[in-house]
Amino acid sequence: MKKIMLVFITLILVSLPIAQQTEAKDASAFNKENSISSMAPPASPPASPKTPIEKKHADEIDKYIQGLDYNKNNVLVYHGDAVTNVPPRKGYKDGNEYIVVEKKKKSINQNNADIQVVNAISSLTYPGALVKANSELVENQPDVLPVKRDSLTLSIDLPGMTNQDNKIVVKNATKSNVNNAVNTLVERWNEKYAQAYPNVSAKIDYDDEMAYSESQLIAKFGTAFKAVNNSLNVNFGAISEGKMQEEVISFKQIYYNVNVNEPTRPSRFFGKAVTKEQLQALGVNAENPPAYISSVAYGRQVYLKLSTNSHSTKVKAAFDAAVSGKSVSGDVELTNIIKNSSFKAVIYGGSAKDEVQIIDGNLGDLRDILKKGATFNRETPGVPIAYTTNFLKDNELAVIKNNSEYIETTSKAYTDGKINIDHSGGYVAQFNISWDEVNYDPEGNEIVQHKNWSENNKSKLAHFTSSIYLPGNARNINVYAKECTGLAWEWWRTVIDDRNLPLVKNRNISIWGTTLYPKYSNKVDNPIE
């Protein structure tokens, strides 16, 4: 008996240090909240053993979610405006120009896998968040499911991270624990790899759209544009009247993406105590199927509004040149558009001081704004700027389908012109100058009025000069002049008979010569395009 007790005590003494050493290792493997593993994690967290009751709950959750009957193409849809009536064409006088405004019905259909993040909802956005795939997600107000969570694995795509350093296991996937895990991954890269990769270039995602309606821009950029436009303040009223042209640009500089390993079964994302009945009570059903944020892009998001009061058809080309930095020195019209345009920028991220910046300026300064934050480092921290969701049922990508109709407004300016008459011939001359002026009735139909110069068919002796001012809506200009020869058989001889001339800024009509040899010229200065 004593020998047995001695052996037993010896075994206890031998095993005690081993147990203490094991406890120390376990303690060092978790943070204070016992939520994040600091060791290199496996590709996906191992499923912890379940009791028979917990396994029953997990099986019921899997069966329920995988049995939800819905069409993934119809779950997330944004229907914008429907246009029934297109306003008619109209024209109006504006200073020394006549403006013609035309409207056409257009439509936009956009499939967005990436949902934009703005500051107001960044607190709801984190990798692995469980959300309902419904209209609130479409409206960029994700309805996060408040349930207990199991573990998940995050990975980051910063360069150089080896030996599983780019991954981390979150034992209890709450928002705070996940955000702490993301910070741990970023800090791990800063400490171990940043020196070897001092200039990590941001991945650029660029999209633009000429602005005509808010519904159109929401369909293009997602419902996050509603919040962005509170700062951009696109002037839809002036655009609709043809007095402004504006373009909106989304410019993303992505520093890194944090991705979530796909769950092998839906229940893997839930805590052991969660039941099917709890999910049903939270409104999870075929109309509100569960999804999860599978990837979050961190970086700098710039929204730009480019504005001009030019009526030129080259405005889009000028804006593109300003953004790309392309030289337009050889094109006077593009140069003038850029010179007389402005921009407003709303910037999220990329600054250690301010999370959101609003900047106004001239297009000449635009490139400086876009160049900032081009590389990732401690001084240019990234914020969540976009996220992707997947259906929990089958890990299929959850795509938001946006569509809207809108009225495209275009305007063209026709500058006033002038005809300068100079008669220095050795004869009596008579002129007949006429033109048409075009306006529009309330239905947009053309109203053409024929106009005549008040001095038509009146005899003029040399030296006679006059100027006829024509409005921008003048067209089909006819210039006729004849001279008196004094010959009985040909009392009047035609000097000039030019018809259907276009309106130009300065048209110089000169006649000279003798009764038998009259001459003329028709020269144009500063033609109007």
From Swiss-Prot:
Outcome after substituting residue 491 to A: 95% decrease in hemolytic activity and no stimulation of MAP kinase activity. Does not affect membrane-binding capacity
What is the recorded phenotype of mutating residue 492 to A? Answer: 99.9% decrease in hemolytic activity and no stimulation of MAP kinase activity. Does not affect membrane-binding capacity
In the record, the effect of residue 438 to I is given as:
In strain: F4233 / Serotype 1/2b, F5782 /Serotype 4b, F6789 / Serotype 1/2b and 12067
The cellular location(s) given in this protein's UniProt record come to:
Secreted; Host membrane; Host cell membrane
- Activity regulation note: Activity of listeriolysin O is regulated on multiple levels. It should be high in the phagosome, thereby allowing escape of the bacteria from the phagosomal compartment. Then, once inside the host cytosol, the activity must be controlled to prevent lysis of the host plasma membrane and loss of the intracellular environment. Multiple regulatory mechanisms include translational repression, which is required to minimize levels of listeriolysin O in the host cytosol. In addition, cytolytic activity is pH-dependent.
- Cysteine pairs bridged by disulfides in the record: none
The protein's name in its UniProt record: Listeriolysin O
Which source organism? Answer: Listeria monocytogenes serovar 1/2a (strain ATCC BAA-679 / EGD-e)
